[in-house]
């Protein structure tokens, strides 16, 4: 798929298709008005006849419009002009791309990037158009015997920008959008892989491959023997019921002019399958527990995008790979684990395993003396109850870092909402036998999970992203979303300086 930007008049475009917007009720966008004038009112006559109202997502494909050089014109319903917001814009782009791909328009010039989207500039509109296009065209069918094929798929897309001065901004937006989309695709692919393929060793192989592909990335894999030497007893306990070895993949990206500059650390929960262990989950939808490694998948995707963008940062990405299975060797409710930090944890529920893996990973990264640490995990069902499937949960021990991540979430459209972490919630983790319990009861489950992790992140600025509600979708079109890759990459773009962003 080839992307480019240009600045030109619609009547001069010689392409398979021109894409322009129509607002409710049957109001032509400025670009559509130009085409209508050139075609002697042909388009407006169709609208008066009622062929298109302009409601969001409506499509009308026109052939051989009078006096127009392009073969086709696609009219796209954009809703009410003053109500065109971020979500609607992205939905319109996705529907447009699907229509172009299905109708044999192998190339197109898209003028939707000239629409006014409240509070957003050309950079944002072009980048989101690229990301939405890639998202719309994504498929995961490698395990199907008969793969459906599009006869004449969309291969080339040109986004028009209002002025020539904005061409460089548009080109940067395409570069960023493609890099982020590459990371999102990598994350989706990892998440969608079946758990009999994507085990901890598979995660490690992907981390090694990333190092093979980019000179700026090195990877080392820590297996169970080394974990024992490091004292990662909590991490090891979670995986001891599985015949698949637990593996923690450590990817180091060196892009900063000073190789010794303090790194940003990203940690991803990589439970490649979570049965719940002895505290076995219900069988209904248990297949979706292959997505319990989507935190690690998003960190992997962010590292890939980072390497493609070649940002001037030092970043460490940790994939905390593990599998939680029931067996005679599994850890049990009632066990007391000594973590790498020396703190002890009473296990009350073996299905609250992600925090037992992450706590040792959080201790491990102290050796980097990090600038900050962000962990990502599909950690709690409570986050789905609190925030649904639209917004990531965010907790942090450092206000400036939390504000940075919230800002990045707003910029990228991959939204997050900060939850509190006051001392009262910590009391729910009290145990009569150990330093803490691994669960704090039903009330405030996302917050108490964050409070648990915070006890292992006292030596640096830390934030936790709970993506349990956003990492995948269920139902007939189930699959990984690749979130929060774009949030993480936007955070890294912002950290790399204004010249890297807009």
UniProtKB/Swiss-Prot annotation:
Catalysed reaction, written as an equation: Release of an N-terminal amino acid, Xaa-|-Yaa-, in which Xaa is preferably Leu, but may be other amino acids including Pro although not Arg or Lys, and Yaa may be Pro. Amino acid amides and methyl esters are also readily hydrolyzed, but rates on arylamides are exceedingly low; Release of an N-terminal amino acid, preferentially leucine, but not glutamic or aspartic acids
Cofactor(s) the record lists: Mn(2+)
Active-site annotation: 281, 355
Keywords assigned: Aminopeptidase, Cytoplasm, Hydrolase, Manganese, Metal-binding, Protease
Cellular component, GO, one term: cytoplasm
Positions contributing to Mn(2+) 1 binding: 274, 351, 353
Root EC class: hydrolase
Binding site for Mn(2+) 2: 269, 274, 292, 353
Main location: cytoplasm
Cell compartments where the protein resides: Cytoplasm
Superkingdom of source: Bacteria
InterPro entries: Leucine_aapep/pepB (IPR011356), Macro_dom-like (IPR043472), Peptidase_M17_C (IPR000819), Peptidase_M17_leu_NH2_pept (IPR023042), Peptidase_M17_N (IPR008283)
BP term (GO), one: proteolysis
Cofactor note (record): Binds 2 manganese ions per subunit.
GO MF terms held by the record: manganese ion binding; metalloaminopeptidase activity
Entry EC no(s): 3.4.11.1, 3.4.11.10
Entries under NCBIfam families matching the protein: PRK00913.1-1, PRK00913.1-4
PANTHER family: CYTOSOL AMINOPEPTIDASE (PTHR11963:SF23), LEUCINE AMINOPEPTIDASE-RELATED (PTHR11963)
Entry-linked HAMAP family: Cytosol_peptidase_M17
Function summary: Presumably involved in the processing and regular turnover of intracellular proteins. Catalyzes the removal of unsubstituted N-terminal amino acids from various peptides.
Family in the record: Belongs to the peptidase M17 family.
Record protein name field: Probable cytosol aminopeptidase
Source taxonomy: Bacteria, Pseudomonadati, Pseudomonadota, Gammaproteobacteria, Vibrionales
């Amino acid at each position: 798929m080839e992307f480019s930007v240009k600045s030109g008049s619609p009547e001069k475009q010689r392409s398979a298709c021109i894409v322009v917007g129509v607002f409710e009720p049957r109001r032509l966008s400025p670009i559509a008005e130009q085409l209508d004038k050139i075609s002697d009112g042909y388009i407006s006559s169709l609208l008066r006849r009622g062929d298109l109202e302009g409601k969001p997502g409506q499509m009308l494909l026109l052939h051989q419009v009078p006096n127009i050089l392009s073969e086709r014109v696609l009219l796209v319903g954009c809703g009410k002009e003053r109500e065109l917001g971020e979500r609607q814009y992205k939905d319109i782009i996705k529907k447009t791309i699907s229509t172009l791909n299905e109708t044999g328009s192998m190339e197109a010039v898209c003028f939707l990037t000239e629409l006014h989207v409240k509070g957003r500039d050309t950079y944002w509109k072009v980048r989101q158009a690229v990301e939405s296009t890639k998202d719309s065209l994504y498929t995961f069918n490698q395990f199907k015997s008969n793969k459906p094929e599009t006869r004449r798929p969309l291969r080339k897309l040109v986004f028009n920008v209002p002025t020539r001065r904005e061409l460089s901004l548009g080109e940067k937006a395409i570069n960023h959008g493609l890099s982020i989309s590459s990371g999102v695709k990598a994350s989706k692919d990892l998440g969608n892989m079946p758990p009999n393929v994507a085990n901890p060793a598979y995660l490690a192989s992907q981390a090694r491959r990333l190092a093979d592909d980019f000179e700026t990335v090195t990877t080392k894999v820590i297996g169970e023997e080394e974990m024992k030497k490091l004292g990662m007893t909590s991490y090891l306990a979670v995986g001891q019921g599985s015949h698949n070895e637990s593996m923690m993949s450590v990817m180091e990206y060196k892009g900063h002019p000073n190789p010794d500059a303090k790194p940003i650390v990203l940690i991803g929960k990589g439970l490649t399958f979570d049965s719940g262990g002895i505290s076995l989950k219900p069988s209904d939808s248990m297949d979706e527990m292959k997505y319990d490694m989507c935190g690690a998948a998003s960190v992997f995707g962010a590292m890939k995008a980072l390497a493609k963008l070649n940002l001037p940062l030092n970043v460490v990405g940790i994939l905390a790979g593990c599998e939680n299975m029931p067996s005679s060797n599994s850890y049990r409710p009632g066990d007391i684990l000594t973590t790498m930090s020396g703190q002890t944890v009473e296990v009350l529920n073996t299905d609250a395993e992600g925090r037992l893996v992450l706590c040792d990973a959080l201790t491990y990264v102290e050796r980097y003396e990090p600038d900050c640490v962000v962990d990502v995990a599909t950690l709690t069902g409570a986050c789905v109850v609190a925030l649904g499937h639209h917004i990531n949960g965010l907790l942090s021990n450092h206000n400036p870092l939390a504000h940075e991540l919230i800002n990045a979430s707003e910029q990228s459209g991959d939204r997050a909402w900060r939850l509190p972490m006051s001392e009262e919630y910590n009391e729910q983790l009290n145990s009569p036998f150990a330093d803490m319990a691994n669960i704090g009861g039903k009330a405030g489950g996302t917050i108490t999970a964050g409070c648990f992790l915070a006890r292992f992140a006292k030596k640096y600025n830390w934030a936790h992203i709970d993506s349990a509600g956003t990492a995948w979708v269920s139902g007939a079109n189930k699959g990984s979303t690749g979130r929060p890759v774009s949030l993480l990459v936007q955070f890294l773009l912002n950290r790399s300086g204004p010249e890297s962003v807009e």
